Amino acid sequence: VNAQPKPPASVQALIVIDMQSAFVSGRGAVPDADRLLDTVGDLMARARESGALLVQLQNDGEPGAPDEPDTPGWRLHLPVDAGRGEVVLRKSADDGFEETRLEKVLREAGVTALALCGVMSEMCVSATARTALDLDFRVVLPHDAHATYDIPAAEGISDAVPAAVVSRVAEWALGDEIEVAARACDVGFTKP
């Protein structure tokens, strides 16, 4: 129901969620991380070329977590171009708006429509999307630009659930207000 049959209208900002080394490289990488990195990297390049606002959210994990601050896993895996005014916002909750300047940054730039990408589909991507919708932003979620882990089997509950299914269920659960683009390459960008 919420998959768009045609490419969505252009957006003015790209929010890159938790593309940190712990989640996209090495043993802890989400399944198909190389494809995700290519897809998100392409989105970032196209956002930069168009003059759209680019914000990277960086999760501050708990002590001992793979994304604990100032550890190799915490580092953003894709480069930030500070010379273009790109913004990095640290967060400690799933929701990228909670106790961050994200709403202020978007409003001050004049953004009304944004695209989200990154990890984890059912956690930080979903929570950030829900708040963006609640704040009346138009939200586009490219189906191939977010990811998560497989859910392991739970005896008496379910078999294992593949990561791709978890991601699809997460985007479906966001309802009809979100625009799900089938492919990230269909998302267009414009200046705010």
Question: Language-model segments: which ranges?
Answer:
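N-terminal nucleotide-binding beta1-loop-alpha1 segment
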Residues: 14-19
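Glutamine-centric residue-chemistry signal
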Residues: 20, 56-58
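Short acidic, Gly/Ser-rich segments with clustered Asp/Glu that frequently serve as metal-coordination loops
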Residues: 21-26
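Short, solvent-exposed loop/turn segments at secondary-structure boundaries
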Residues: 27-31, 66-69
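A short alpha/beta connector and helix-capping loop motif
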Residues: 28-56
